[in-house]
């Protein structure tokens, strides 16, 4: 149910940017307050990304007020912070559906709105897209402006600097708004973040701020900023130095929660020539005390009552697979000080908080830089360490060349703990772990494991730790484990060997991963054999051969793209063995999987027991 818009009298007048631009500027502070309150109540009703959007309310209002969107292009990096943008661009009455099946997309999405000029979800893409749009705008000579909004967390990724370097060289008109809240999903790390953090200290921050104030009062922008920088800050490392060296004109920092200052500054900068950076300081979670105090914990939230100032208590239940991994990592680190945990800025999500606290010298946050994280692991392996790279399936895509060139080619024993394999649900197509089995299976020297439950996950992680002939990967899903009894003792599994879980007749289900429980349920109605294959690569050749010889039909089951996945590996093996056999592949279709709850998505894709049974019966009937 949507909120009663009559409770928000100014916001009610600004359902679109055109309506917003008709408001007198004096009403913008009230509009920002109402927008923040609407966002707070809306996310409380629907769940979703929370703290980031609270921090960009004033910026969103100012951008749509000054720029002629959608004619002028506005690109949001990642998109966590774009909920206010959705509210102001005609989607206010559907905000309660965000991230839900058939509801609003969780991120800016081109198919959803003309105001969403570039579909996003992964970090660091906005500057490249904005540069291309700026070049196109110059070719068209229609007076179109281009703005990219990027957070300080995304500035730790190399793609951003590749794009900025190119933009500085081409020198097209574009604006990059650096939203500096000193907080991405995990604390930012590295020299750049330390550089930005200096803004908050004493004379250094005050001097830059005063220079920017003079710019705001109408002085010739580029000339005056250069003059003040030279006079006051010569010989010091100033915030703008990095951007100036890359060919950008730097303005800031300014208060990102002062909507009037933002409007005036954006007006001043709108017609400046060449690439520009506006550096704004914001607070993630602004306006809601619990989120201000704990922006990481309030990054994304379930449904909650804002008036209670706390998230709903989580019911005691099964551990998540991320927690299973985190516990294993701590257990193995106690035994071996050469175990090193690496994450690309996903400490909380990957279950590594306890490890980072207990073993700080063995913990490495590579920031939002997946390529670097993978090759960092390769370098450690060269020196005899035991690197464990904990990474989401969707983000491993970003380190694919490094996986091939730096790890597998050299047969380096790097263990990849791949979280969020398969359906992740509400974050949609940018985050579904649909492709990892396919893109890893074709890489020589890889060992790929898919546990069916938490105990098997623990043993497979240990197997990967023990394996020193090359890289290995353990791929597990988001969410709660299955409830299997965990065995504390760790035993390395025989490489490339599966286990028969149920003996039946005629039909054999070859299962890869946590779809095992559903496969067993479906098998009861079919009196089918079920095999927990365990290894996607190498396949258990003897077991596949045995199943083909003793059954009429084989069915492969995986929560991965059918094309190139584990089932394709079974078909390739049967071809090599010259054993023609009917094989039904159950998995993800050749399409990007939309958002919805995991259960809804799995049901729609017929990956639950009911759906598997229906697919198998239809195959047998034909």
Curated annotation (Swiss-Prot):
Q: In which pathway does it act?
A: Metabolic intermediate biosynthesis; 1-deoxy-D-xylulose 5-phosphate biosynthesis; 1-deoxy-D-xylulose 5-phosphate from D-glyceraldehyde 3-phosphate and pyruvate: step 1/1
GO MF term set: 1-deoxy-D-xylulose-5-phosphate synthase activity; magnesium ion binding; thiamine pyrophosphate binding
The keyword Magnesium appears for this protein: yes
- Cofactor needs: Mg(2+); thiamine diphosphate
Residues annotated for thiamine diphosphate binding in this entry: 80, 121-123, 153-154, 181, 288, 370
Q: Which GO terms describe its cellular component?
A: cytosol
Q: Which UniProt keywords apply?
A: Isoprene biosynthesis, Magnesium, Metal-binding, Thiamine biosynthesis, Thiamine pyrophosphate, Transferase
Checking SUPFAM superfamilies in the record gives:
Thiamin diphosphate-binding fold (THDP-binding), TK C-terminal domain-like
Provide a GO biological process annotation. Answer: isopentenyl diphosphate biosynthetic process, methylerythritol 4-phosphate pathway
For this chain's record, the cofactor binding note is: Binds 1 Mg(2+) ion per subunit. Binds 1 thiamine pyrophosphate per subunit.
Task: Report which reactions are catalysed by this protein.
Answer: D-glyceraldehyde 3-phosphate + pyruvate + H(+) = 1-deoxy-D-xylulose 5-phosphate + CO2
Q: Which residues bind Mg(2+)?
A: 152, 181
HAMAP family for the chain: DXP_synth (MF_00315)
**Which family is this sequence assigned to?**
Belongs to the transketolase family. DXPS subfamily.
- Cited function: Catalyzes the acyloin condensation reaction between C atoms 2 and 3 of pyruvate and glyceraldehyde 3-phosphate to yield 1-deoxy-D-xylulose-5-phosphate (DXP).
Q: How does it assemble?
A: Homodimer.
Question: What protein name applies here?
Answer: 1-deoxy-D-xylulose-5-phosphate synthase
Recall the taxonomic lineage recorded for the source organism.
Bacteria, Pseudomonadati, Pseudomonadota, Gammaproteobacteria, Alteromonadales
List the gene name. dxs
């Amino acid at each position: 149910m949507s909120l009663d818009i009559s409770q928000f009298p100014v916001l009610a007048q600004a359902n679109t940017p055109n309506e917003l631009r008709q408001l007198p500027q004096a009403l913008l502070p009230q509009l920002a307050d109402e927008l923040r309150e609407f966002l707070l109540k809306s996310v409380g009703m629907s769940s979703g990304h929370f703290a980031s959007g609270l921090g960009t309310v004033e910026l969103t209002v100012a951008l749509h007020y000054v720029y002629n969107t959608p004619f002028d292009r506005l690109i949001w990096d990642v998109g966590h912070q774009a909920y206010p943008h959705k509210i102001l661009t005609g989607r206010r009455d559907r905000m309660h559906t965000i991230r839900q099946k058939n509801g609003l997309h969780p991120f800016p999405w081109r198919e959803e709105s003309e105001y969403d000029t570039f579909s996003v979800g992964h970090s660091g893409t906005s500057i490249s897209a904005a540069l291309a749009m700026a070049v196109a705008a110059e070719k068209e000579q229609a007076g179109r402006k281009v703005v990219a909004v990027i957070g300080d967390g995304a500035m730790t990724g190399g793609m951003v600097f590749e794009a900025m370097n190119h933009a500085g060289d081409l020198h097209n008109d574009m604006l990059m708004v650096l939203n500096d809240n000193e907080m991405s999903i995990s604390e930012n790390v590295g020299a750049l973040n330390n550089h930005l953090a200096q803004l908050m200290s004493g004379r250094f921050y005050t001097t830059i701020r005063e220079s920017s104030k003079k710019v705001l009062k109408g002085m010739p922008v580029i000339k005056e900023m250069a003059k003040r920088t030279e006079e006051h800050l010569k010989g010091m490392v100033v915030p703008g130095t990095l951007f100036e060296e890359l060919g950008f004109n730097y303005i800031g920092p300014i208060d990102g929660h002062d909507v009037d200052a933002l409007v005036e500054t954006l007006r001043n900068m709108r017609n400046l020539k060449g690439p520009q950076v506006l550096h704004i300081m914001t607070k993630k979670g602004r306006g809601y005390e619990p989120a201000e105090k704990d922006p990481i914990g309030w990054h994304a939230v379930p449904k909650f009552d804002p008036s209670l100032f706390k998230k709903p208590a989580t019911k005691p239940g099964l551990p998540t697979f991320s927690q299973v991994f985190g516990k294993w990592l701590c257990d193995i680190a106690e035994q071996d000080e050469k175990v090193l945990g690496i994450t690309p800025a996903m400490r909380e999500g990957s279950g590594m908080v306890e490890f980072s606290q207990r073993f700080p010298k063995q913990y490495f946050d590579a920031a939002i830089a997946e390529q670097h994280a993978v090759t960092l692991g390769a370098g450690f392996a060269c020196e005899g360490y035991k690197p464990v790279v904990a990474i989401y399936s969707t983000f491993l895509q970003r380190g694919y060349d490094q996986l091939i060139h730096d790890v597998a080619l050299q047969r380096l024993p790097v263990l990849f703990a791949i979280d969020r394999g398969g359906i992740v649900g509400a974050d949609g197509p940018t985050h579904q772990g649909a492709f990892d089995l396919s893109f890893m299976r074709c890489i020589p020297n890889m060992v790929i494991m898919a546990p069916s439950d938490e105990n098997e996950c623990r043993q497979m992680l240990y197997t990967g730790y023990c394996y020193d002939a090359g890289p290995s990967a353990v791929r597990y899903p988001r969410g709660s484990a299955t409830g299997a009894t965990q065995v504390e003792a760790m035993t390395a599994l025989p490489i490339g060997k599966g286990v028969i879980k149920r003996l039946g007749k005629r039909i054999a289900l070859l299962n890869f991963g946590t779809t095992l429980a559903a496969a067993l349920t479906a098998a009861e109605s079919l009196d089918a054999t079920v095999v927990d294959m365990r290894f996607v690569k190498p396949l258990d050749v003897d077991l596949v051969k045995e199943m083909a010889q003793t059954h009429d039909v084989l069915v492969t089951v995986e929560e991965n793209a059918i094309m190139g996945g584990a089932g394709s590996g079974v078909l390739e093996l049967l071809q090599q063995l010259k054993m023609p056999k009917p094989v039904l592949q159950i998995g993800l279709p050749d399409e990007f999987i939309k958002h919805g709850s995991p259960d809804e998505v799995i049901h729609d894709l017929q990956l639950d027991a009911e759906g598997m049974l229906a697919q198998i019966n239809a195959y047998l009937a034909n």
